């Protein structure tokens, strides 16, 4: 089992991240945080910056600006040990077609420092037993995707990043994938075009548009309160300190240094106090989060 | 098992499973055998002279074979590139794993290329020592080509372009003695000594195990592997 991230720290922190390909911006000042155990969907049309963001979080692409922290580590740090706490399934699963499913998963488990029984465990978990002895190159798209997911979770990571995990799957395979993802106890960030599936798996949705984070809302925000994002002033008390003074330590949740979830009834007092301290309120959101709202955002067609 | 050894075992297994290893060994054995028959064996030459010519020109073939092996290993591993980039392993472990697999294949290639030379020995000419020294020279030339190929492919996005770049570097090193004739005497000795086969296979081809030549070739190989690790680590961040 990989070591846990530092207590209380968000599982994912993205602070002002931008990424340019030559002069072309793929991400522009994206900021958000993900609490441990949260299931977050990354939504957006093709070219919105989802894959770029996931690659930055996976530590395979450096941001042009901004800061990222994942599973308690900065992906750019030279020691790659933190990667044992991360699972990543890119759009194209990183498979060795010449190996059998079982041999491949044993190989990946060993590379990621998992115990000897990890491969057998994940084969059962992903229902790959009937195909364990088959060469990966002979598998159908659905099974290849399943092996790709198995390699991402074989070492029981704390944070799992999935880039279009359901792409090309038939309804039965999609349902099996959903069941599997719902059974995992970890922090999940996935991008997908299947809104109905996303609505069943995720509890929070981030919407990217042309590299900008334009919506950030949760499935239970209406019950749990409102999400508040702040641009901190350079001097004076930190936003976190002001919230403690106004509503106490147990009445709000810090998503990251600049984002908080507060009770709906506290919002006026909190906003007044933050503005009085010179902080800028970037967003105060109380969206309803349903499949119909997702469809309303993206229109009839999937993003 | 360390990550490098695990990667080496996988890469070697992949060479075997895809048939690339057997195609490599067969082609190398054929090319070197034809080379011996066409260029080295001559009834006017002594067996020692024939073997010396065989081991000299064959070393260039081994350098090229090393480059081909590097290209094969990199192309085979490209679809799963994201695997190592997101795994808790360092670039030098991956390079070492690939190099070990390639070195084993190179060693097998040397053995596969010895069939006709062994026939010379079996006919009562030459000596076991000559074959061993020649084989060691070949192996060192092969792993140098392999390391330079890995270095080239680590720095360039396209594996073929990387292998060609490694080959260009190798050719440039081998041509240094020709450049040496045109420079000041102070540089002449240095440039002459830079050629891996031309300057450092002479003892091996004549059946002598020269430690200084082995150290030079292994040192050059090590430098190429370090460069490959640096290039590979930079590629971790490539789009």
Residue ranges of each PLM-predicted region?
Chain B
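Hydrophobic/aromatic residues in alpha-helical transmembrane segments
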Residues: 67-74, 147-148, 223, 227-228
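Helix-loop-helix units of permease transmembrane domains in multi-pass membrane transporters
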Residues: 74-103
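Membrane-embedded or membrane-proximal helical elements that form or frame transporter/channel pores
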Residues: 37-78
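Short alpha-helical transmembrane interface motifs in multi-pass membrane proteins
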Residues: 67-72, 97, 101, 129-134, ...
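Aromatic- and glycine-rich beta-strand/loop motifs that create alpha-glucan
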Residues: 1-25
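Terminal transmembrane helical anchor/hairpin motif
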Residues: 39-53, 162-165, 169-239
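Hydrophobic alpha-helical transmembrane segments in multi-pass membrane proteins
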Residues: 22-27, 64, 68, 101-118, ...
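Secretory targeting signals
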Residues: 35-37, 53-56, 62, 96-160
């Amino acid at each position: 089992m990989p070591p846990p991230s530092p207590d209380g720290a968000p599982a994912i922190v993205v602070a002002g991240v931008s990424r340019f390909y030559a002069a072309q911006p793929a991400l522009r000042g994206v900021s958000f945080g993900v609490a441990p155990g949260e299931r977050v969907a990354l939504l957006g049309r093709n070219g919105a910056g989802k894959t770029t963001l996931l690659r930055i979080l996976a530590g395979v692409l450096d941001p042009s600006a901004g800061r990222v922290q994942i599973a308690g580590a900065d992906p750019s740090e030279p020691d790659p040990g933190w990667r044992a706490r991360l699972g990543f399934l890119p759009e194209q699963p990183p498979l060795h077609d010449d190996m059998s499913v079982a041999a491949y998963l044993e190989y990946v488990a060993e590379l990621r420092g998992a115990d000897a029984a990890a491969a057998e465990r994940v084969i059962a978990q992903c229902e790959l037993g009937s195909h364990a002895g088959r060469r990966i190159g002979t598998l159908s798209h659905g099974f290849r995707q399943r092996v790709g997911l198995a390699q991402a979770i074989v070492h029981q990571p704390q944070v799992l990043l999935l880039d279009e995990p359901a792409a090309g799957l038939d309804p039965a395979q999609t349902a099996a994938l959903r069941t599997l993802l719902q059974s995992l106890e970890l922090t999940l960030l996935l991008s997908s075009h299947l809104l109905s599936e996303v609505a069943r798996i995720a509890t929070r949705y981030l919407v990217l548009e042309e590299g900008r984070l334009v919506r950030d809302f949760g499935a239970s925000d209406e019950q749990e309160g409102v999400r508040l994002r702040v641009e901190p002033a350079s001097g004076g008390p930190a936003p976190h300190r002001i919230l403690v003074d106004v509503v106490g330590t147990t009445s709000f949740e810090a998503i990251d240094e600049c984002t908080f979830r507060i009770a709906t009834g506290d919002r006026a007092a909190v906003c007044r106090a933050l503005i009085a301290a010179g902080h800028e309120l970037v967003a105060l959101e109380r969206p309803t989060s349903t499949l119909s709202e997702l469809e309303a955002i993206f229109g009839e067609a999937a993003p | 098992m360390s990550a490098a050894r695990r990667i080496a075992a996988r890469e070697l297994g992949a060479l075997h499973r895809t048939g690339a290893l057997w195609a490599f060994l067969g082609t190398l054995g054929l090319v070197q055998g034809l080379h011996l028959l066409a260029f080295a064996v001559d009834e006017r030459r002594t067996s020692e002279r024939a073997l010396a010519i065989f081991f000299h020109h064959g070393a260039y073939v081994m350098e090229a074979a090393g480059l081909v092996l590097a290209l094969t290993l990199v192309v085979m591993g490209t679809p799963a590139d994201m695997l190592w980039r997101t795994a808790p392993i360092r670039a030098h472990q991956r390079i070492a794993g690939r190099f070990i697999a390639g070195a084993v294949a190179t060693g097998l290639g040397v053995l596969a290329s010895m069939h006709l030379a062994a026939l010379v020995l079996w006919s009562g000419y030459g000596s076991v020592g000559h074959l061993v020294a020649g084989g060691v020279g070949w192996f060192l030339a092969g792993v140098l080509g392999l390391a330079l190929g890995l270095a080239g492919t680590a720095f360039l996005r396209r594996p073929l372009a990387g292998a060609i770049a490694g080959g260009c570097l190798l050719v440039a090193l081998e041509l240094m003695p020709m450049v040496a004739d045109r420079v000041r005497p102070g540089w002449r000795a240095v440039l002459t000594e830079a050629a891996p086969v031309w300057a450092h296979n002479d003892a091996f081809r004549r059946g002598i195990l020269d430690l200084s030549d082995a150290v030079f070739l292994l040192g050059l190989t090590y430098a190429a592997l370090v460069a490959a690790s640096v290039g590979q680590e930079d590629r971790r961040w490539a789009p």
